Amino acid sequence: MQASIESTGNLERRLSFSLPEDRLQSHIVGRLGEIARTTRIKGFRPGKVPAKVIEQRFGAQVRGEALDGLLRETFDAAVREHDLRIVGSPRIDKGEEGEFSFVATVEVVPDFGDIDVSKLTVVRHSAEISDADIDQMIENLQNQRRTWAPVSRGAQDGDLVAVETWSQAGEERLPAEGTEKGSIVLGQGMMFETIEKGLVGLAKGEEKTLDVEFPADWRVPVLAGKTVQVTVKVAEVSEPVVPAVDEAFIKSFGVKGGDVEQFRSDIRANLERELKGALMNRLRREVGEQLIAAYASVEMPPRLVENEARAMLAQQVEQIRRNGQNVGEIPADAHEGFKDAAAKRVLVGLLVGEVARVNDLRLEAKRLNETMRLIASTYEEPEQVIEMYRNDPQLMSGLQNRVMEEQVIDWIAERAQHTEEKLSFQDAIRQ
């Protein structure tokens, strides 16, 4: 097959090629013949359906499938013929040389030159899980199951305080009538610090007027940038009641027999999974920042960056919607604000791929299986999760890409100049 190539930009190529019409027709005839032998149509015996009926009923579908398949096959052959390493998806348009001619516009991997990772400087972090970390996690689990008991004393940090508030901004009262009601846990920064400190010591039925400074960008214009008198009245004070770490509490987390040592062992295993992921994320950032600094001058494929920026915007919009917030109308150029970050992400991704290609790094089956089992172990039916991955090509492909990226990141870090830094568990997981 002959395919012509034209350079239309630093990283853009245009491939012109034609489909072999004889192969297309041969495929269509063969596929229609298969359908004729196996299909059942009312009024005809199996295998005796006239070719004209088969053509009328299935011709368009078979032709479309054959055209798509041969188009992919011919395009792939053209890419191999010209030894192109393309990125992203091609844009394929009809050509001007007849019904079966096509033009594919593609972007190619930029030339990074000799990638010498030994010149990079990477900090490798490590951490260990202590008994104190396990104790802290158990305390967190207790607090998740806490209940609240009303008390008559004054409020203190950690208490749940039901409050009524109203504000006076000059001549304007907010709300105009009545009060705003809500509840906060003191000491968690849920309200302005002035208000939280003002509530400390107040008991049920007591009130206090406070001078509160509102930021200039506050959502209520009449309060923005002003010092406002805010009156708080305590409706109720409740103290936390945390459950004891007893057999019933431990069993509620799926630990059979309620054994405390098994409970701590399970918690340690969970923390180790969390720590492993956190340390890899730190290493990924370290290596990524070094690669960006070293290869920032290399031009990235514009269309690939554009698509990545749009994907990042869509991800942020989806996150906002999941949080229950209204996104409103999105400007057509909203993705432009993501382009710098998108270009860096594309650069790191392409460099990681090039390191793997040049050094013939292959996906390690052992590491893939370990990662799959690690993910599955966080579910109640791990074997079902493993089976789901094995039966879903898209899911498995995503996992393979992730594991391969981690392999390459490790490979780079091992060969770069690196220093070791030990962190506490809490610092290590703080992203």
From Swiss-Prot:
InterPro entries: PPIase_dom_sf (IPR046357), Trig_fac (IPR005215), Trigger_fac_C (IPR008880), Trigger_fac_C_sf (IPR037041), Trigger_fac_ribosome-bd_bac (IPR008881), Trigger_fac_ribosome-bd_sf (IPR036611), Trigger_fact/SurA_dom_sf (IPR027304). It comes from the Bacteria. It is an enzyme of class 5 (isomerase). GO terms for biological process: 'de novo' cotranslational protein folding; cell division; chaperone-mediated protein folding; protein transport; protein unfolding. GO terms for cellular component: cytoplasm. It catalyses: [protein]-peptidylproline (omega=180) = [protein]-peptidylproline (omega=0). Residues 158-243 form the PPIase FKBP-type domain. Its EC number is 5.2.1.8. One of its GO terms (molecular function) is peptidyl-prolyl cis-trans isomerase activity. Keywords: Cell cycle, Cell division, Chaperone, Cytoplasm, Isomerase, Rotamase. It is found in: Cytoplasm. Belongs to the FKBP-type PPIase family. Tig subfamily. Consists of 3 domains; the N-terminus binds the ribosome, the middle domain has PPIase activity, while the C-terminus has intrinsic chaperone activity on its own. Involved in protein export. Acts as a chaperone by maintaining the newly synthesized protein in an open conformation. Functions as a peptidyl-prolyl cis-trans isomerase. NCBIfam families: tig. This is Trigger factor.
